[in-house]
């Protein structure tokens, strides 16, 4: 995001789009972005339900889209990304698969690097997507503060602390694996 500061710092309206398990991560990201007041308007759209009227009718440079996909190949999400690009809307990708269609189509993005999922429930990718969206929300909040000359609020500080504690929390949870196996 820093490399594209001039472009992304102009975004006032953000749309998050995804399908399947990733739509839940998108909804979480929307709530965080609203809580942190990152944008004037934040919405989440299931890419399968998307239509052309879902983009706000404002200048393209003030609009952004975050496309979230585990595989990076989700056709409905890729379609929304292409619609955004055709309108010169800034598109960011949050994908798990390096070199995927969505990763190649967007101008910037984040690879989750959660590893391959082996189950229907996308727990690893979902967890990684939530963390990445939290970091993206913090970046935009920090940018808004920088441009507006304001300072970080309590919600921002709490989110940063929670993210810093994640490795310890996950380590503790993994340490309970044997106990859970015995109980089960």
Language model region names:
Residues 1-65, 73, 85-99:
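Anionic-ligand anchoring segments at beta-strand to alpha-helix junctions in alpha/beta enzyme folds, i.e.
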Residues 1-15, 108-184:
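Active-site phosphate/pyrophosphate-binding segments
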Residues 27-30, 34, 78, 133-137, ...:
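Predominant activation on well-ordered alpha-helical scaffold segments within soluble catalytic domains
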Residues 63-146:
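Phosphate/diphosphate-binding loops
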């Amino acid at each position: 995001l820093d490399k594209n500061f001039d472009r992304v710092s102009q975004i006032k309206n953000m749309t998050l789009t995804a399908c399947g398990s990733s739509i839940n991560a998108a909804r979480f990201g929307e709530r965080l972005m609203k809580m942190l007041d990152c944008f004037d308007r934040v919405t989440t759209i299931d890419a399968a339900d998307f239509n052309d009227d879902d983009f706000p009718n404002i200048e393209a440079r003030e609009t952004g889209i975050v496309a979230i996909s585990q595989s990076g190949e989700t056709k409905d999400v890729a379609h929304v990304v292409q619609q955004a690009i055709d309108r010169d809307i800034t598109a960011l990708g949050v994908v798990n698969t390096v070199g995927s269609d969505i990763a190649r189509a967007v101008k910037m993005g984040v690879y989750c690097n959660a590893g391959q999922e082996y189950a229907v429930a996308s727990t690893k990718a979902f967890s990684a997507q939530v963390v990445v969206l939290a970091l993206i929300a913090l970046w935009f909040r920090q940018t808004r503060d920088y441009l507006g000359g304001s300072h970080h609020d309590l919600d921002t500080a709490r989110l940063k602390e929670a993210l810093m504690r994640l490795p310890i929390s996950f380590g503790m949870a993994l340490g309970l694996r044997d106990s859970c196996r015995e109980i089960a």
